[in-house]
Amino acid sequence: MSVFCTYPWKQLFSDSYGVYMPCCMATVDHPHDGCWHGAKSDFPAPKVNEVSPSEFFYSDYMKQLRSDMRGGKTTPLINKVCANCINEEKQGRRGLRNPQQNEPLGRVIEVKLRLFGNACNLSCYMCRIKDSSSRIKQTEKLMEIDPEFGEMLEYDKLLDEMKHGGMNYNVTEDIKKLAPRIQKIYIIGGEPFIMPRHYEVLNALIEIDQAKNIILKYHTNLTKLEWDCLLYTSDAADDKQCV
C-alpha cells in the first residue's frame, strides 16, 4: 500500500465549522463532535479565524506530514491522519487518497475553504443541515413539533454562527499571497451565488493578474444567478472554469 498522497501539497481545506484539515477525510484534533466518522487524532486543527490559510499550509505539522509521506513508509503520523483512507483501502475500497510517484510542483493548490457562510435558498434533503441555513430553519420548525428531529439531525452540534448564516472570514490578502501556487479555487457554501463576499476574492485575483491562471469551480444549485458570474470566466486559464 502506497503511503504517498498529493492532498497535503495540493489542497487547502476548511470544513463547515471553520476548521483547517489536510483534506476532508483527515482525522484531526477537531474541536467539535460530529466531524468525519466522529474519529479524532492529536493532529492540530486550528480555526480559520485564528490562523491564516498560508500559516496553516506552511505550518511545521503540515511540513512533517509531507516529510513522512516522502519517506515512503507508514509512520504513526500517517496512520493517525490518514486512518479513514487506510481503512477504506484495507477493505478493498478505493480511498480518497491520490498516490503519485513524485510530489507535485508549480500550481498545485486547490483552495476549498468554507469562508463565506452557509446561507442557502433551498432545503435539499441530501445536504447536511450545517451546510444550509434553510435546512437549519426547517429543522427548528420540526423541533417545535417533536424535539427528536433536532437530535436526529444533530442540531445541538451546530455553532451559534451557523444558525445565522454561518461564519464569514476575510482572507483575501492571504489568498493573494498564495495565488502563484493556486491551480483551482472551489467556491462552496451554502449557495455561493447568494454570498457576494466571495467576489471580493475573485476581484482581488483579477487585480493582481492571477485569475487567468486559476480554474474556478462552484458548488451551486444554479437557481440564483443574480450576479453575472460569467464575466469572471473570461479571466480563466484556457476557459476551464466549471460553473
Predicted regions and their residues:
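Accessory C-terminal segments flanking Radical SAM cores
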Residues: 1-99, 109
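C-type cytochrome heme c attachment motif
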Residues: 83-84, 122-129
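Short functional micro-motifs and their immediate structural scaffolds
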Residues: 90, 125, 132
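Short cysteine/histidine-rich zinc-coordinating motifs and their immediately flanking basic loops
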Residues: 93-102, 132, 136-140
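Core AdoMet radical
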Residues: 108-119, 128-167, 180-196, 208-228, ...
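Leucine-rich repeat
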Residues: 173-178, 204-209
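Single conserved hydrophobic/aromatic residue that forms the stacking wall/gate
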Residues: 232-243
